[in-house]
Amino acid sequence: MKKQVLFIALVVAITASLAAAPAAEAADTAKTVKVFLLAGQSNMEGKAPNTLLDYQAEDPKTKDLFKHLRKDGKWIVRDDVFIKFLERKGPLTIGYGSPDRTGAELEFGWMMGDRFDEPVVLIKAAWGGHSLFQQFCSPSRLPEKEKKFQQDMATWEKAHEAALQKGPKIRLRDPGNDRFKPQPYGSSYRAMLAEVKETFDNCETMFPALKGRKLELAGFVWFQGWNDQYGGAEKEYGSNMTHFIKDVRKDLGVPNLPFVIAAMGQNGSTPAAGPMLTIREAQMSMNDVPEFKGNVKAFRTDVLVDKATEEPSPTLVKNGELLKKPAGDGGYHYNGSPIWFTRIGHAMGEAMLELMKGQK
């Protein structure tokens, strides 16, 4: 109950913050800021190593894809697009992914900055390993999940107590180990909303160049799916996604907020199967929900694959040293390919601009 009260208070505070921003139709572009919320798990964090990005930006075979992001051999730092990614913030450039890495936010933010006269702020709320089923579970799904959480917690507490009776040190694989302790449902959803509130409340402190401007929440981008492949969570992904979209719009106070979904596609050129295919189909099915017509757009990411990273046994970037192969991470992270992440960011941007154009 206490958690519920705190969440309601957070939603009220966010709605009040957003209400201070003028509606898009009446916005004075000289005094507003376009804000885009980017959420998901590790791939929304961004997994393309900067060392590999630097290399491909100078390699004659790949440099054309990145030339608009560079000037005089260096990465451009935007003075009209800003980003907040958890504890980090600043003008948009490379490096706003996981440590020493970059994600789809770079190309997406570039496109938004080039399209709008107003400054742009990206709020990135992403945490590796978090599922829509659990951590990103939205409020309208919580009541039915709370019972399961209590059951899981009771089971774990019993196992934990039994393990402690065997000795103070609990084996790593013992079901009573802390790593198996059930996590609260909706924790990342609430943290995501808190990121929005913090940015709206403290924007002028975070980004002094935006002093005196009003923030306008303009769109949402979702890039997630991997952790819903387990425990049968994929079977309810479509329902969970529908609830999530509706709840986000309700809690942020923007009824038809443009919502882009980068559908799961780590399979690349290999046909998707099993839970991965189920999740992708659920994500793509959002295009067919009648009430989402014209305000939700899902697209496939597997068709954007950087095929060079699918070569047998690609060598990774290790210990900061670039071993000149195109893959910078494992398959679950889109091979850590700067090309793949850039293509995904571009597709995100195209989808967002299409939705926004249709709403005018």
Predicted regions and their residues:
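Cell-envelope and extracellular/periplasmic
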Residues: 26-360
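Boundary at the C-terminal end of the N-terminal hydrophobic targeting segment
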Residues: 19-26
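Bacterial N-terminal signal peptides
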Residues: 8-17
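Bacterial N-terminal signal peptides that target proteins for export
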Residues: 1-9
